[in-house]
Amino acid sequence: MLSLQTIAKMAVATNTYSKYHYPILKVFGLWWKNSTLNGPIKICNHCNNIMVGEYPMCYNHGMSLDIALIRAVKERNISLVQLFTEWGGNIDYGALCANTPSMQRLCKSLGAKPPKGRMYMDALIHLSDTLNDNDLIRGYEIFDDNSVLDCVNLIRLKIMLTLKARIPLMEQLDQIALKQLLQRYWYAMAVQHNLTTAIHYFDNHIPNIKPFSLRCALYFNDPFKIHDACRTVNMDPNEMMNIACQQDLNFQSIYYSYILGADINQAMLMSLKYGNLSNMWFCIDLGADAFKEAGALAGKKKKSVTAHIRS
């Protein structure tokens, strides 16, 4: 049951107020100040998202109650952790990113089940397997800059994430930090399953994600996202074509790269190299004629493919 004080704070947070009320709000505990935020805490009347500052609506500015709680735990803001938990935030999510003994004790006192061992990995996998916008965003917020993953087998974790994302997240396993790997993982899962709310959130919160967003759009054959990413990302058309050819039936990605000037003969050979014969025939329809090179390449792979090419 909510306390009278909790209900009163919720009532105040859902109403409009002027700057003259700011001193009262600070005393009342409805103020959030950190390196990026400094303003009154509000609850959106339309979606119940948490807003900080002067915004008439929460679009682009709000965060769910769970996300607000996770961020408060990471900042070790005891009063806000208590406030958001009282308002209905899931303190179990907070416990997953409580990196100090004092915050772990606080989360436990508020009802969280202390996570141990594989619970961290199980939570990461669960939040991505639900294929839900909110769970992907929660997963990103919980495990971004979370030192609890320092104790896991990083090579094994990187391989697992790459297999689940279905798109190469890095060139080599030792050439990317875990933080960046996880950011790419959450983004790739959102693009792969067309979770538009999560994509929009990551576009606004993950720094320098645009080059990888173009790679995802090419790999998952999304011409609209390719066009959007190409406005801000300058990638060589042949590199774009190489990405497009890695997944079979990527006709729109191949055609987009071809229109930008990619070598269609090289695309034909790359498609054959990756074993994507539908892509190869599409390249031939676009004018590719590297049959001699393709025959030699196919001969190294399978004799049956060689015969098929030469027939």
Swiss-Prot record:
Induction: Expressed in the early phase of the viral replicative cycle.
Function: Plays a role in virus cell tropism, and may be required for efficient virus replication in macrophages.
Gene Ontology biological-process entries: taxis
Annotated source species: African swine fever virus (strain Badajoz 1971 Vero-adapted)
Family: Belongs to the asfivirus MGF 360 family.
Domain of life: Viruses
Keyword annotations from UniProtKB, A to Z: Early protein
Protein name: Protein MGF 360-16R
InterPro entries: ASFV_MGF360 (IPR002595)
